[in-house]
Amino acid sequence: MSFSEQLDSRSCVLLRLGERRFALAADQVAELVAPSRIFRFAHRSSQIDGVILRRGRVVAVCDVAEILTGKSLGMRRFYLIATRGQHSAMDWVALPVSGECELIQADLTPAGASDSPHVAAWLSHDGEVIEVLNLNALTPGAQTAASEPEAHA
């Protein structure tokens, strides 16, 4: 396979989590919104900070910065609303981001077998190699909740 056959040119959204930048495929991004009231309640997933209400939907807020950078985000400038799941069961998830987001066109290199499950691909932008995120591996979803035993009173 030649180098040009390995590349897949796609639109991506760059997002900032602390000092690092990551990317999502643009077709996974629903919108970028200002932080709003977050509702917190008792639940079993440590990966969910709470929920926000957006366009008539309850959207889980998942701070993935701690998983990706080792530090939780102190300042949340925006929520990047993204889709995750399969075509028959798409969920929205809100990812807190600490800076501006940018839409770019980039050549993607597929993730290798030795890469972490949360890496869908790699891209190069402004001399920086950036991970393109796999939200299905990074955020909790229906398959996670279904595999956990029910709690009975």
Positions of predicted regions on the chain:
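An acidic, low-aromatic, low-complexity terminal/linker signal
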Residues: 1-153
